[in-house]
Amino acid sequence: MNSQKPFLSEPIHRFLDDGVVIPALPLALTSSRQFDETRQRALLRYYMDAGSGGVAVGVHSTQFEIRDPEIGLFESVLSLAAEEMKAYEARTNRPLIKVAGVVGKSAQAVKEAELAAELGYDIALVSLSAFKDGTNDHMIEHL
């Protein structure tokens, strides 16, 4: 008998199997290109209230820039989004699939995945952009 913890909780697994829309979260910035926490929360609430099945954070349009040490927004953006999604779940009793983008070579990707797990994310969407010159074997080992 397999004693490992299931990869996804049963409600999240069932929800995902039913088929849901999970939009990628754009980064909300002020006109002076500073992180706009108020508008970021509003954007998250818009997606959730519109019926999305979850939100993917730190992917696509925000994937690389928020990780830049000079910008330093990766943890802040993931944390804010997780907090807003958990509040929505508590308020509506409707599960959301929380997806975190994970990038970089294995050490960075593992660190990002561990942070996402600590914040309550369900799934990591792994970018293989760091392996553009790598072999398939290197990418498979990374995953």
Sequence positions of predicted segments:
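Active-site beta->alpha loop and helix N-cap motifs at the rims of alpha/beta catalytic domains
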Residues: 2-143
